[in-house]
């Protein structure tokens, strides 16, 4: 599934609204993922506290949302732009790529809850396609 020019514009515009609160959105989405999909906790076993709002979750949000913001900037070449990050996830972190979809879903829910006016159906579809493309790019080095 490829992103159209309109999709890219919608994603960039929406990210412009979100980026000022990206840390809060990341913490909420990561906390949500750890509660709704408890199997993902295995990747964060080194954290002393995995509960939503804990310091480790707050720290993890910066990594995740920084990567999302970076991906928005590389929206025209996600595969090439996220190649190094894909390599880290595949070889060093050994994260099951199915988990990218789980986090993407939690991000979508978080955006919908926090931006009910801005996160229209059209924006939702564009951001969903974008996150699916990011997930595919991150999974590329698993092959």
Swiss-Prot record:
Domain of life, source organism: Eukaryota
Transmembrane segments: none
Keyword match Iron: yes
Pfam families: Globin (PF00042)
Xref: InterPro entries: Globin (IPR000971), Globin-like_sf (IPR009050), Globin/Proto (IPR012292), Hemoglobin_a-typ (IPR002338), Hemoglobin_oxygen_transport (IPR050056), Hemoglobin_pi (IPR002339)
Domain Globin: 2-143
Family statement: Belongs to the globin family.
Name this protein carries in UniProt: Hemoglobin cathodic subunit alpha
Lineage of producing organism: Eukaryota, Metazoa, Chordata, Craniata, Vertebrata
């Amino acid at each position: 599934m490829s992103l159209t020019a309109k999709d890219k514009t919608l994603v960039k515009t929406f990210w412009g609204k979100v980026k000022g609160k990206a840390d809060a959105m990341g913490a909420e989405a990561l906390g949500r993922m750890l509660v709704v999909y408890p199997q993902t906790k295995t990747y964060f076993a080194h954290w002393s506290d995995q509960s939503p709002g804990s310091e480790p979750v707050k720290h993890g949000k910066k990594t995740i949302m920084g990567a999302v913001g970076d991906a928005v900037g590389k929206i025209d070449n996600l595969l090439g732009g996220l190649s190094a990050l894909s390599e880290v996830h595949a070889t060093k972190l050994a994260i099951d790529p199915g988990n990218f979809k789980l986090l993407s879903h939690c991000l979508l829910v978080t955006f919908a809850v926090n931006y009910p006016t801005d996160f229209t159906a059209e924006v939702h579809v564009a951001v969903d396609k974008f996150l699916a493309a990011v997930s595919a790019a991150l999974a590329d080095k698993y092959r």
